Design a protein with these regions (language model features):
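Active-site pocket-lining/capping segments in soluble small-molecule metabolic enzymes
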Residues: 1-254
Length: 254
């Protein structure tokens, strides 16, 4: 892994996060000896015995947060419960959530098993101003969880991002392909390519380029990503204007 976010890039002014999505990225990160304030590990890796062993070892020395799917349905409660069991077996109690349903499910599971889930909201959850952040914090508390920080929405400009705080830590995504559509419809299934395994295909658009579409078969939905990767690099004036607590870089399946 090269170009990992680290304190030397940001002069120690900001905490740093990285998002590992594949087994290869996880192995490379561990072997590199790099250290960040937070490491996100994609939920799909928790299905693999070897990955769970590596994740548990990583969690002994660094803060690890498990990401969760973009969509879960009532019929997937058992699958979701098994996923949380695998995550908890790695001594992880912090989760990057993508929807309100996951917060409710985590709260129920936490009450049954005696732990308080710590929540990091992803950029897709509604946190567009301080009032919505307060409302979300109340919802999370009622569910028996604890709001740790929020990821700033992509739709906000830099001045608006600076106004979203109210005592809650914020995270700014500096590098990644942005999810532009999340759907229960499956492109691979439409093309007759469904093999019930998580996978990626590419859609070519003459005007806007190539889009990566990730099939999340374990929870039966797909995620289309932007054709171009956002990369703000180290723009000190921009970061000072946003003033986030964390800066995040996502490694992608490209």
């Amino acid at each position: 892994i090269s170009g990992t976010v680290n304190d030397s890039i940001y002069d120690g002014k900001y905490r740093t996060s990285v998002y590992l999505k594949t087994k290869g990225q996880l192995k490379s990160y561990i072997l590199s000896g790099l250290n960040n304030d937070n490491v996100y590990v994609d939920f799909k890796l928790f299905d693999d015995d070897e990955c769970r062993k590596n994740i548990k070892e990583l969690a002994d020395s660094q803060n690890v947060t498990a990401t969760l799917p973009y969509i879960i349905t009532q019929s997937q409660n058992r699958i979701f419960g098994s996923l949380i069991e695998n995550i908890r077996s790695c001594n992880i109690e912090m989760f990057l959530v993508r929807n309100l349903e996951e917060i409710g499910c985590l709260g129920n599971l936490g009450q049954k098993t005696g732990f308080v889930p710590k929540i990091v909201t992803d950029a897709g959850l509604y946190c567009w101003n301080s009032f919505s952040v307060l409302q979300l914090r109340d919802i999370i508390s009622v569910c028996g969880c604890e709001l740790t920080r929020i990821t700033l929405p992509y739709e906000l400009n830099y001045k608006e991002m600076n106004m979203v705080n109210y005592g809650v830590r914020t995270e700014f995504v500096a590098e990644r392909f942005v999810p532009v559509m999340i759907s229960k419809q499956c492109v691979r299934k439409t093309y007759g390519l469904c093999d019930h395994n998580n996978g990626i295909i590419y859609l070519n658009n003459k005007r806007s380029g190539t889009y990566m579409v990730e099939s999340v078969c374990s929870f039966c939905h797909s995620v289309m990503y932007s054709a171009k990767r956002i990369d703000v690099g180290y723009d000190s004036s921009l970061l000072e204007e946003i003033n986030p607590d964390y800066i995040r870089k996502d490694y992608d399946n490209m």
